């Protein structure tokens, strides 16, 4: 196990005390809001640090007592009984704190932009893209998050050729960021008379929703085109005369939106563009840091096949962590927490391993 970063722990305690003092002094409302946000972020970490420090002190006291021959035998026997318990508590606390003290992803608390595109497999791929969107929509509903479709292009037989949506809530990106990649489906299409299993795929991209403070977009770097657009109808698609296409000239990124008004379109297209540019920046930074990355989880490679959904066997396999679950029906209803948590645990384990190598 990697050693706990003692200096970092002391710095967090010092900062926490400083925030408490500043909040007690009655600062201006905007300053108080920022301090309160940092306070709530630090509180669980500092609370755990204090519990750990108390346990370490208790262990030292017990060991001193055991070595002191002037202490009566009964007291030493009690100390000997308590010792394994305290050691076990310290070990458990160290494991918890390793996770709490891992470097934080600045985007983890953000909302997210979800993009799903049908890949190989024609109309069956579009149907699968629709199934994936509903899966994430139900997961979001269970979490109390808000889902809003920004644009959608329906498949001829249903589903979506492409669908882009915002998922708004605290910590959405942290939960869904490992969903990016190629999702493959194996099933018998309804139109398949011979009962043969077909394989098709859809690509998922989960981007942290960027705010204006995160990324600057200069007016001279974008071209805005307005055009007539009509969607294919359906629950999530609006028919409009005011579709907007925004091209970011330096990167070549193109975003379209077809809401009911040009103002809404421009705002939503800019929202997606900002998030794509922010994500591209994060990807560049990650690739510079990832030369020694051991974990396939979190590699950010969206061309990588990450998961297979085998309908005849009711099986879902995540290839990055070799996890297979026979609960496909429940997962398609939005019960993806088990996979999400397993991916996060694997990623954290790889971070801990790297920290251990660095020390």
Curated annotation (Swiss-Prot):
Post-translational modification: Methylated by PrmC. Methylation increases the termination efficiency of RF1.
UniProt keyword terms in alphabetical order: Cytoplasm, Methylation, Protein biosynthesis
GO MF term set: translation release factor activity, codon specific
Cross-referenced InterPro entries: PCRF, Pep_chain_release_fac_I, Pep_chain_release_fac_I_sf, Prokaryotic/Mito_RF, RF-1
Region listing for Disordered, in residue ranges: 280-306
Alphabetized Pfam families for the sequence: PCRF, RF-1
Subcellular location: Cytoplasm
Modification sites for N5-methylglutamine: 235
Cellular component GO terms held in the UniProt record: cytoplasm
Free-text function comment from the UniProt entry: Peptide chain release factor 1 directs the termination of translation in response to the peptide chain termination codons UAG and UAA.
Similarity comment: Belongs to the prokaryotic/mitochondrial release factor family.
NCBIfam families: prfA (TIGR00019), PRK00591.1 (NF001859)
Protein name: Peptide chain release factor 1
